[in-house]
């Protein structure tokens, strides 16, 4: 499934876990590629370690956009005051 991940700040590490762990190069504010989802458990885990710590009171985000075949475009924003380590159960089935 095609994806885009927009980061609010430069990252040192990005990991996307759908049951298969991928580590896209974190050298851009926008990452894209293809995710393989587990059709029995469509979920996305995200880990973002920022290059620089956030300023006090500053929130960082990662906006994930998925283009599921036959579905409306799906967008979710992960947000945290520091590094992001979260997961999302997707509201639609993965294509078999």
What are these regions (language model features)?
Residues 22-29:
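Short beta-strand segments within Ig-like beta-sandwich modules, predominantly Fibronectin type-III
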